[in-house]
């Protein structure tokens, strides 16, 4: 049963990653070339919110893996329609002098939003049933597509802007990798590996909690559904991760000024993350999982900051920095797909979810090894 769950989840995740990557290239190009009275971004943002909401509602009604994978892919399309034009609108509307402040605000919003999403989701499961989280997510998607358009100044018409042709070559240009850039590829591999290490536990968290941490829930005499302790644990971990991430955001700057080489800072952070992983691996309990979330959230916050610095330092050509950084960000998707595949294979071979922790440790340590091999 465990292997079937893991394989089904891996299929859904990989499909979502592939569809998302293709959708990002297509939507970005189409949004840039949209010529209507409402502007280039507004129609896509509204449509993205609607598509995401409708597909999420349909996803909650599906029970077979093929349908779930298909609908999850369509949710990703809607999400890309919502977020890619929104990010472009930020870049176009925010003056350079305010951009650092806005970027920080967006980062804080993402951290808080992720935690809120978890809390709302688990509350919906406990108090409303299994379909309620999908309805809540659909409502949030709909609001996300409408509220920004109402709050922002009205976007000017794009009808008078020059028309530019779109070609397959132009779409594929997004996936063109930098050439003769060994250090860049090391940074890319390091990021992919650490993303895989993080994804191995977060992706399978529900299964880890229900099949490993609370596997003796009913034999211990408890009568309430296992979803109650699982949801409580996941909510507690979300809070711990948020606290750790905020702590990392405050300390990253001063530490980076004291130790100038980001390679060492990234490696130390990777080691700290493996220590966090070792806690539930050696002492599986709700307490160790919360400690893992707290320490891991702090460590990954540092890894994320210093990894970006390493990537920027490894760019082969300043003239193509924007394109190369966009390509570097594909490492997050590669890591997510790797986590799904490694996790599914590991669970299928061992028949349990405890293998995910040592597998994650190997990935994170491999990332540290690649990082330290980079030339400064």
Predicted regions and their residues:
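Intracellular juxtamembrane helix-capping segments at the cytosolic ends
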Residues: 81-94, 302-316
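Juxtamembrane intracellular "pre-TM" segments in multi-pass secondary transporters
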Residues: 155-190
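A membrane-interface helix-boundary motif in multi-pass transporters
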Residues: 40, 125-139, 345-364
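Hydrophobic core of transmembrane alpha-helices in multi-pass small-molecule transporters
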Residues: 55-56, 66-82, 288-302
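Glycine-rich segments within core transmembrane alpha-helices of 12-TM secondary carriers
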Residues: 100-125, 329-340
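Structural signature of the two symmetry-related core transmembrane helices
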Residues: 41-57, 264-278
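Helix-to-loop junctions at the C-terminal end of transmembrane segments
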Residues: 23-38, 247-261, 347
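A late C-terminal transmembrane helix in Major Facilitator Superfamily
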Residues: 319-349
């Amino acid at each position: 049963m465990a292997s079937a769950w893991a394989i089904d989840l891996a299929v859904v995740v990989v499909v979502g990653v592939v569809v998302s990557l293709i959708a990002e290239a297509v939507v970005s190009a189409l949004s840039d070339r949209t010529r209507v009275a409402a502007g280039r971004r507004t129609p896509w943002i509204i449509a993205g919110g609607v598509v995401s909401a409708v597909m999420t509602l349909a996803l909650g009604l599906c029970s077979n893996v093929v349908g779930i994978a298909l609908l999850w892919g369509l949710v990703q399309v809607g999400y890309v329609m919502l977020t890619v034009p929104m990010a472009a609108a930020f870049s176009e509307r925010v003056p350079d002098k305010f951009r650092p402040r806005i970027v920080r605000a967006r980062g804080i919003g993402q951290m808080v939003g992720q935690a809120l999403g978890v809390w709302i989701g688990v509350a919906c499961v406990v108090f409303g049933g299994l379909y309620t989280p999908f309805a809540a997510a659909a409502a949030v998607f709909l609001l996300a597509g409408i509220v920004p358009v109402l709050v922002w100044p009205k976007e000017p018409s794009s009808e008078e802007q020059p028309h530019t042709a779109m070609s397959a070559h132009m779409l594929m240009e997004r996936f063109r990798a930098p050439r003769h850039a060994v250090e860049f590829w090391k940074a890319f591999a390091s990021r992919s590996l650490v993303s895989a290490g993080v994804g191995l536990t977060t992706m399978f968290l529900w299964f880890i909690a229900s099949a490993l941490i609370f596997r003796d829930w009913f034999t211990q005499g408890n009568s309430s559904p296992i979803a109650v302790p699982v949801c409580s644990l996941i909510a507690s971990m979300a809070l711990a991760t948020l606290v750790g991430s905020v702590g990392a955001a405050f300390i990253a700057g001063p530490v980076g000024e004291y130790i100038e080489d980001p390679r060492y800072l990234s490696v130390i952070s990777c080691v700290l993350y493996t220590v966090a992983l070792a806690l539930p691996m050696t002492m599986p309990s709700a307490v160790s999982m919360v400690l893992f979330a707290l320490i891991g959230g702090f460590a990954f916050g540092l890894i994320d900051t210093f990894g970006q610095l390493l990537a920027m330092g490894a760019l082969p050509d300043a003239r193509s920095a924007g394109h190369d950084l966009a390509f570097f960000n594909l490492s997050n998707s590669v890591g997510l797909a790797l986590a799904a595949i490694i996790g599914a294979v590991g669970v299928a071979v061992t028949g349990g979810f405890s293998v995910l922790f040592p597998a994650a440790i190997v990935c994170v340590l491999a990332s540290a090894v690649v990082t330290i091999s980079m030339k400064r």
